[in-house]
Swiss-Prot record:
Biological role stated in the UniProt entry: Antitoxin component of a type II toxin-antitoxin (TA) system involved in plasmid partition. Inhibits the anti-DNA gyrase activity of toxin ParE; reverses and restores gyrase catalytic activity in vitro. The parDE operon alone is capable of stabilizing an RK2-derived minireplicon under defined growth conditions in several different Gram-negative bacteria. It does so by the post-segregational killing (PSK) of plasmid-free cells, also referred to as a plasmid addiction system. Binds its own promoter, autorepressing it; gentically only ParD is required for full autorepression.
Gene (UniProt): parD
Xref: Gene3D superfamilies: Antitoxin ParD (6.10.180.10)
Protein name: Antitoxin ParD
Organism of this sequence: Escherichia coli
GO MF term list: protein homodimerization activity; sequence-specific DNA binding; toxin sequestering activity
InterPro entries linked to this entry: ParD, ParD_sf, Ribbon_hlx_hlx
Further comment: Plasmid IncP-alpha RK2 is maintained at 5-8 copies per chromosome.
Length: 83
């Protein structure tokens, strides 16, 4: 992997750091997304997946679980029944 070094003022560095922090990202993540915006869709999908899985995990820990078996859920999904 290659490394890129950019000389900037302390003010520019602080601004870049703040912009990245506002989006919950590292400076590296923020800069790469700005340089290569085509990867943003994949990054957004990854963030959505992490959020969805986090919600599911929290629901499970709170006792909100299904009493159905995996087979029953699969059969429902394949038949289109969404009861």
């Amino acid at each position: 992997m290659s490394r890129l070094t950019i000389d900037m003022t302390d003010q520019q560095h602080q601004s870049l750091k703040a912009l990245a922090a506002l989006q919950g990202k590292t400076i590296k993540q923020y800069a790469l997304e700005r340089l290569f915006p085509g990867d943003a869709d994949a990054d957004q999908a990854w963030q959505e997946l992490k959020t969805m899985l986090g919600n599911r995990i929290n629901d499970g820990l709170a006792g909100k679980v299904s009493t159905k078996s995996v087979g029953e859920i699969l059969d429902e999904e394949l038949s289109g029944d969404r009861a």
